[in-house]
């Protein structure tokens, strides 16, 4: 099972990636993990990437694609892999295609933006204990207070509505076009393209997992 998982920030990709990887016995691969591992190992590509990052520049798609090919050639990818957060742009998707990396599925987890904003902006946490709440779905007994200590709950910067909306704007501009890219490729070249599937990411976690596994079985 070789697949790409697509979806907006807050759509639940990380949660579902864990279940999918467990079901198929495949690793979850992100470009960040690949870069860190290559730099730590001191590989030629890792040293190239480190020099670029140290200069404050972005690592080129060419280096990323070479890292991807190195990573998926490792033994733990014998049964497949799940790309999380990659490709991020049409240019990366084109480079992946040109490199001949074979894929079975592209799975999109679709959640309306307003639902994502509500889901993320409603999160609250008690930093000292790690306890988490949600103003609508899992509210504390007293608004804004931790249930056990009565201490104030905090909202992470990443979860503030303005920040969430900005992240969704970036996704719409850079990554959302990949949905059209892969769905179009699947229509015009069904024998060569990965199968494109889209599921709803709303509902209980177990319901979404069931949808994902069903989509990957057909």
Swiss-Prot record:
Presence of the UniProt keyword Kinase in the record: yes
Its EC number(s): 2.7.4.3
Residues that coordinate or bind ATP: 10-15, 123, 132-133, 203
InterPro entries: Adenyl_kin_sub, Adenylat/UMP-CMP_kin, Adenylat_kinase_CS, Adenylate_kinase_lid-dom, P-loop_NTPase
Subcellular localization: Cytoplasm
GO molecular function: adenylate kinase activity; ATP binding
CDD domains: ADK (cd01428)
Enzymatic reactions: AMP + ATP = 2 ADP
PROSITE patterns: ADENYLATE_KINASE (PS00113)
Disulfide bonds: none
Binding sites annotated in the UniProt record for AMP: 31, 36, 57-59, 85-88, 92, 156, 167
Domain statement: Consists of three domains, a large central CORE domain and two small peripheral domains, NMPbind and LID, which undergo movements during catalysis. The LID domain closes over the site of phosphoryl transfer upon ATP binding. Assembling and dissambling the active center during each catalytic cycle provides an effective means to prevent ATP hydrolysis.
HAMAP family assigned to the protein according to its UniProt record, in alphabetical order: Adenylate_kinase_Adk (MF_00235)
Stated role: Catalyzes the reversible transfer of the terminal phosphate group between ATP and AMP. Plays an important role in cellular energy homeostasis and in adenine nucleotide metabolism.
Family: Belongs to the adenylate kinase family.
Name by which UniProt lists this protein: Adenylate kinase
Gene name, Swiss-Prot/TrEMBL: adk
